[in-house]
């Protein structure tokens, strides 16, 4: 089955992944590609539509991102957003100008609803502006289809060539008609069907993995988290017993997690599973290491070394499966965005790794991964399991990792998760966990002065981990969690709750 494809061309804007999500919400498959992608590569991909993202540059900047002018003559509908709008105008000999007054935030916009882009919309609505330049003269063959008080060309079109540009950001919630506008572009301009689904994605991945692997042997990096679990099941459905799952118990797991993973995948799914007890090995490598990036790199490298050793025991292994998902790739940086933190499945891989990679989920957001898991028949409880980073509790114990600190964090986290479940909040909160911030403080217990650890509780709401907000957990639940931890976990005398959104913070503390 050939899927309809929309390309999102990345010019370094902060909302690029949100654009991709908006497209996929319409059951249309899209890929984000760098602006340096050649015309030949674009032709080979044969997209049904192209979207230019925003970006921080001016079209007149010395190193401003460009595209080949030929792209506009391919007969493929193009939608330019913000910088993408200005670039289209500049490339086609329109004029872009810096205004006296910058336009930023919620703005009233006048729409020409005779345009396919604004079909069935109000003549005046609210949009979100964030720009310093604007189009002062549209290219030949274009007409203005939207204006604001400060922007004489808030949108333009060449309906004959199916070229559209908008100065505002339709992908954000503050543009009240944005989702409808993108839907109009996809279905009225690009004439797409919207038939991409998680079931079709799974079918295509299974077929592709069969073809890629052939009769070769595959090893899977299984952590028991949602991502690696879904990846393992997809590959298992494709090649069966050619797959061996290696579960590295590095001593950085949550309470009782190792036994649960072994029971589910060995007994329930009938997979070839090897459990490697490597706690001492990992803690030895992490001894004296406090820097979070070094911890991630060390753990990533040691994981691969363990896999290589297990692979040699198994014989001729050609491929390694990883549960890398799209936000992992984004957070590890691209050519047009800054690196936020190295992901263990990306930045931590040694350059001399001996396996070819299979990453069946690298194009999916977390909610899409869960949907694939449901399609594959993975138990609901496992599919909705809490996200857990590959480095495990090593990045929830701030500073040097020791057995004592791990034990404290593990017990506190188990209590937090247990009380969240009792309160019926498991599926209402995206992610929740306890971490040890490496802070000690004075307290009083049993009429005696104490100087013990602080536990930080973190809980966030999100749909894809790209952005998140802190969860409004009822006070009575937080109160019970706090009282239980200080009473049941030794060396803890203070509990704090993290009320920071992402951005500016990341979900994990390290």
UniProtKB/Swiss-Prot annotation:
One of its GO terms (cellular component) is cytosol. Pathway: Purine metabolism; GMP biosynthesis; GMP from XMP (L-Gln route): step 1/1. It catalyses: XMP + L-glutamine + ATP + H2O = GMP + L-glutamate + AMP + diphosphate + 2 H(+). Residues 5-195 form the Glutamine amidotransferase type-1 domain. GO terms for molecular function: ATP binding; GMP synthase activity. Pfam families: GATase, GMP_synt_C, NAD_synthase. The keyword ATP-binding applies. The active site is at 82 (nucleophile), 169, 171. Residues 196-385 form the GMPS ATP-PPase domain. SUPFAM superfamilies: Adenine nucleotide alpha hydrolases-like (SSF52402), Class I glutamine amidotransferase-like (SSF52317). Keywords: ATP-binding, Glutamine amidotransferase, GMP biosynthesis, Ligase, Nucleotide-binding, Purine biosynthesis. Homodimer. This is GMP synthase [glutamine-hydrolyzing]. The lineage of its organism: Bacteria, Bacillati, Bacillota, Clostridia, Eubacteriales.
């Amino acid at each position: 089955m050939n899927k309809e494809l929309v390309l999102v061309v990345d010019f370094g804007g902060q909302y690029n992944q949100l654009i991709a999500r908006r497209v996929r919400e319409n059951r249309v498959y899209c890929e984000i590609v760098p602006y340096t992608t050649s015309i030949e590569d674009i032709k080979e991909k044969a997209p049904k539509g192209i979207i230019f993202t925003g970006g921080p540059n001016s079209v007149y900047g010395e190193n401003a991102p460009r595209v080949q002018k030929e792209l506009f003559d391919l007969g493929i509908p193009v939608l330019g957003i913000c910088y993408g709008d200005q670039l289209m105008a500049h490339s086609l000999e329109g004029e872009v100008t810096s205004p006296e007054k910058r336009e930023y935030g919620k703005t009233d916009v006048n729409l020409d609803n005779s345009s396919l882009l604004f079909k069935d919309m109000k003549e005046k609505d609210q949009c979100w502006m964030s720009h310093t330049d604007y189009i002062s003269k549209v290219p030949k063959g274009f007409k203005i289809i939207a204006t604001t008080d400060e922007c004489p060309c808030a949108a333009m079109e060449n309906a004959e060539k199916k070229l559209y540009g908008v100065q505002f950001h339709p992908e954000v919630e503050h543009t009240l008609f944005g989702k409808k506008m993108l839907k109009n572009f996809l279905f009225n301009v690009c004439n797409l069907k919207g038939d991409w689904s998680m079931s079709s994605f799974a079918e295509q991945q299974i077929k592709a993995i069969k073809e890629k692997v052939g009769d070769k042997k595959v090893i899977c990096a299984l952590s028991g988290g949602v991502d690696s679990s879904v990846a393992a099941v997809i590959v298992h459905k494709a090649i069966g017993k050619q797959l061996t799952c290696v579960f590295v118990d590095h001593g950085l797991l949550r309470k009782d997690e190792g036994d649960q993973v072994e029971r589910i995948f060995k007994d329930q799914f009938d997979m070839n599973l090897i459990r490697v007890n490597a706690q001492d090995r990992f803690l030895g490598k992490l001894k004296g290491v406090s820097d979070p990036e070094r911890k991630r790199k060390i753990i990533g490298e040691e994981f691969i070394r363990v896999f290589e050793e297990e692979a040699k025991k198994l014989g001729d292994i050609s491929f390694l499966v990883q549960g890398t998902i799209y936000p992992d790739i984004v957070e590890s940086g691209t050519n047009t965005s800054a690196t936020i933190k190295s992901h263990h499945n990306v930045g931590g891989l040694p350059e001399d790794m001996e396996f070819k990679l299979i990453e069946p989920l690298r194009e999916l957001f977390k909610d899409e991964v869960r949907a694939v898991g449901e399609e594959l028949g993975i138990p609901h409880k496992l599919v909705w399991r809490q996200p857990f980073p590959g480095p495990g509790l090593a990045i929830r114990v701030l500073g040097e990792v020791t057995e004592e600190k791990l034990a404290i964090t593990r017990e506190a986290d188990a209590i937090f998760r247990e009380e969240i479940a009792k309160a019926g909040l498991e599926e209402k909160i995206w992610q929740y966990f306890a971490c040890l911030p490496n802070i000690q403080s004075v307290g009083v217990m049993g009429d005696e002065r104490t100087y013990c650890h602080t536990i930080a509780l973190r809980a966030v709401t999100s749909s894809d981990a790209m952005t998140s907000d802190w969860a409004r957990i009822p006070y009575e639940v937080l109160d019970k969690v706090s009282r239980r931890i200080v009473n049941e976990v030794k060396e803890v005398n203070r509990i704090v709750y993290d009320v920071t959104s992402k951005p500016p913070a990341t979900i994990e503390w390290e």
